[in-house]
Amino acid sequence: MAPSPRTGSRQDATALPSMSSTFWAFMILASLLIAYCSQLAAGTCEIVTLDRDSSQPRRTIARQTARCACRKGQIAGTTRARPACVDARIIKTKQWCDMLPCLEGEGCDLLINRSGWTCTQPGGRIKTTTVS
């Protein structure tokens, strides 16, 4: 009778080093931690990219991209010059100043064509933001 192929010893079994269960538990926990940390909490935002162009005199053009995890009825916007989740109605009606985009002490005015807003500082400096 020929020997059963299942009872024979495998030659490649010793090729892999033995790893303890502690190692695998650590690897699983590390991967879960990485997956958990890459997700935002509901109602929060983070800046992903920020580019500044100061090639023109007396003018700086800044572009930023934010990633938000907004709740139902909210959409990514700006509050106090930071990315934030705001009421979707504000974006639909283009009433930008309703989301309080300017810093405290600054005045907010809509652009004539409602394509953005301006924040006027007490000293007269004006920051213009357009929405794309």
Curated annotation (Swiss-Prot):
A single GO molecular function term of this UniProt record: receptor ligand activity
For this UniProt entry, which residues form the secretion signal? 1-43
* InterPro entries named among the record's database cross-references: Chemokine-like_TAFA, TAFA-5
Which GO terms of type biological process are on file?
G protein-coupled receptor signaling pathway; negative regulation of vascular associated smooth muscle cell proliferation; negative regulation of vascular wound healing
Source species, domain of life: Eukaryota
Keyword Secreted on this protein?
Answer: yes
**Claim: RNA-binding is one of the keywords in the record:** no
Q: Which residues are glycosylated?
A: N113
Official protein name in the record: Chemokine-like protein TAFA-5
Lineage from the top down? Eukaryota, Metazoa, Chordata, Craniata, Vertebrata
The protein's gene is named TAFA5
